[in-house]
Amino acid sequence: MLIDRFESLEAYFASPYVAGVSERLRIENKILEHGDAGLHAHCWACSRVEQLKINPVRTEYGLQWREALRCPQCMLTARKRFGLHLLAESMQPGAPPPYLTEQVSYSYVAARKHWPKLVASEFLPTLTQRLVQSQKLKFLTRSLRANARHEDMTALTLGDASIGGMLSMDVLEHIADTPAVLREARRVLVPGSPFIITAPFLNGSQSTSVRAVQEADGSIRHLLEPEYHGDPLDPAGVLCFYHFGWDLLDGLRNAGFARAEMVFPWDPHFGYLSEQNAFVAFA
């Protein structure tokens, strides 16, 4: 996988990666011409070439490929495939199984084929939620033994230094207490293991945009227009607290991670085009 890595905003802006944006856009516009023929690319999750659906979202900033290029076999979009691919490439040889912060999803089904002893969970604080999602999981995995696991990312039940990697895809922005999540991730990871985060990212901003805060009494105070993201577990959606800036790297370092960086893949061979990125920190 072709990927660029940066430890600061300054290094990012001074890089050939930023200078090469015009050429990448030229190639992506050529890919658009494939239309219904799709993009033939290697799906990491399926371990074979598939015809990915070309359906980028057009925004005021250009084409958004993050949730596009879905594989017709595993059903994973580019963002999901990239997250799992990056996790596999970042883990240490012989490491314990990783932890995925989602379970009732196609990502979990795909990940389990690569890590049979994978740990995975959802945020399901009530018994009713756990029962409902367990039924969905049984259908998704075609296993009557499947049960949804509840975890609060600010207070994990996992043991210290017990997992070989952690992948959180578009979850962190929905949790008010970011520092608690980062501390817990560092606690449960084996030294040298990766914590990989995908989340809304302001690639030109050092500072995180705080959209809402949770008060001591549990109430929510909105600082910006409320933004709700689609949630497969809740049709009402889930509130977004943050659009992260480069300062999340400092937060990871302050939580005890030895190294933190922002990574940007761009590799048509795997179906990873513009707007893919992830925070990566090593315990």
Give residue ranges: language-model regions.
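A short His-aromatic
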Residues: 170-174
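Conserved N-terminal segment of class I S-adenosyl-L-methionine
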Residues: 1-155, 159-161, 212, 267-282
